[in-house]
Curated annotation (Swiss-Prot):
Residues 371-394 are annotated as: Disordered. Residues 17-204 form the B30.2/SPRY domain. CDD domains: SPRYD3. It comes from the Eukaryota. Residues 372-390 have a biased composition (Acidic residues). PANTHER family: RAN BINDING PROTEIN 9-RELATED (PTHR12864). This is SPRY domain-containing protein 3. InterPro entries: B30.2/SPRY, B30.2/SPRY_sf, ConA-like_dom_sf, SPRY_dom, SPRYD3_SPRY, Ubq-SigPath_Reg.
Length: 442
């Protein structure tokens, strides 16, 4: 019996199918490898840094450098980023700049070749070496450091890199453009340091509005976990515990010339833990106004007044979005001034708001009341035979608070040495307030 031979072309077709199958498998494996390589290539790198969303915090032992490198380089379409200093920590050794893709994470940005960085602790620029040159001012909590590449640099092999502080240009430098691009980097070097990273930040134009923002910043003597934007204060802290207080304290204390200020709640945030009041100049940055000695404050969330204690007393109504809270001092006529240049010239100030009119009326009533009782007070002092404590003599005042133009209450207080400074505290995420430190001036 004769065997039937299979056609040769059938065997060849099966071999072709088998080869195609293996080629397809190899192709799929190759695609997977390419994707893995690309995923690894565009992956953020960090060491001794704790990353929580856009928040970076130092997570090393004392003396160890912490370094973070973003996953993608700056491009012509995205040529700028910013870093907000949430907490400057023990030494404030925070660096912001640009580095090559595989930069060593054991060194601060700017220390090694082909990298550059602006260092917050000394205001110096480090450009490829561990020795920096004076570049700008030092940066603290609440400040924003920006870094970018001029768009024209992407068309050539030389990068013109510029830095900003709080939206205003500080200076620029030139360095070679790395083949893989220059990546945003943040360095830290001491306990407690924490920043917020804004990779999609935009640099606004330096116009009159920027100059106005800078002038408002000059009114503040201390800022902790608070950002200033014109008259607006924004909370930048974590809002997770009672020590995450954002504090803003005015540069100058209240006086007989400027004795009142106001705060409007723009955004109550998560809990509306907003407080305004008065505090001594060296008031702790992690304590809400009113909680520690040398301070008194009205708290929006519960309507209580706190006077040098963590326990408040019922005082007034709660405050919500859109409410205007005010605080001022009624100075007696025998008040001992800190400086000879201060006088009660504020009687002739121009009144601009209902709140201000109410404040003026209360002040006048107080003076009239005081003049009518001066003789009685002197007689009582003679009968009692008691002397006023030296540190209290001539320093006693009445602190008052307002809500939407109405005075809601008063509190006797003794002005600490150096004066009572307008102080605002915030303690929950999203809180924003608008401040007017001089509502009685016209």
């Amino acid at each position: 019996m004769r065997r039937t031979r299979r056609p040769r072309f059938v065997l060849m077709n099966k071999m072709d199918d088998l080869n195609l199958h293996y080629r397809f498998l190899n192709w799929r494996r190759r695609i997977r490898e390419i994707r893995e390589v690309r995923a690894f290539r565009y992956q953020e790198r960090f060491k001794h840094i704790l990353v929580d969303g856009d928040t970076l915090s130092y997570h090393g032992n004392s003396g160890e450098v912490g370094c973070y490198v973003a996953s993608r380089p700056l491009t012509k379409d995205s040529n700028y980023f910013e870093v907000s200093i949430v907490d400057s920590g023990v030494r404030g050794t925070i660096a912001v700049g640009l580095v090559p893709q595989y930069y060593s994470l054991d060194h601060q940005p700017g220390w090694l070749p082909d990298s550059v960085a602006y260092h917050a602790d000394d205001g110096k620029l480090y450009n490829g070496r561990a020795k920096g040159r004076q570049f700008g001012s030092k940066c603290n909590s609440g400040d924003r450091i920006g870094c970018g590449i001029e768009p024209v640099s992407f068309d050539v092999q030389t990068a013109q890199i510029f830095f900003t502080k709080n939206g205003k240009r500080v200076g620029s430098t030139i360095m070679p453009m790395s083949p893989d691009g220059l990546f945003p980097a943040v360095g830290m070097h001491s306990l407690g340091e924490e920043v917020r990273l804004h990779l999609n930040a935009e640099l606004g134009r330096e116009d009159d509005s920027v100059m106005m923002v800078d002038s408002y910043e000059d009114e503040w003597g201390r800022l902790h976990d608070v950002r200033v934007c014109g008259t607006l204060l924004e909370y930048l802290g974590k809002g997770k515990s009672i020590v995450d207080v954002g504090l803003a304290q005015a540069r100058h204390p209240l006086s007989t010339r400027s004795h009142y200020f106001e705060v409007e709640i723009v955004d109550p945030g998560e809990k509306c833990y907003i407080a305004l009041g008065l505090a001594r100049k060296d008031y702790p940055k992690n304590r809400h106004p009113g909680w520690s000695r040398g301070s008194v404050a009205y708290h929006a969330d519960d309507g209580k007044i706190f006077h040098g204690s963590g326990v408040g007393d019922p005082f007034g109504p709660r405050c919500y979005k859109g409410d205007i809270m005010g605080c001022g001092i009624m100075f007696p006529r025998d008040y001992i001034l800190d400086s000879e240049g201060d006088s009660d010239d504020s009687c002739d100030t121009v009144i601009l708001s209902p709140t201000a009119r109410a404040v003026r009326n209360v002040r006048n009533v107080m003076y009239l009341h005081q003049e009518g009782e001066e003789e009685e007070e002197e007689e009582e002092e003679e009968e009692d035979g008691e002397e006023i404590e030296p540190e209290h003599e001539g320093r006693k005042v009445v602190v008052f608070f307002t809500r939407n133009g109405k005075i809601i209450g008063k509190k006797d207080a003794v002005v600490p040495s150096g004066g009572f400074f307008p102080t605002i505290g915030m303690l929950s995420c999203g809180e924003k307030v608008k401040v007017d430190l001089h509502p009685l001036s016209g």
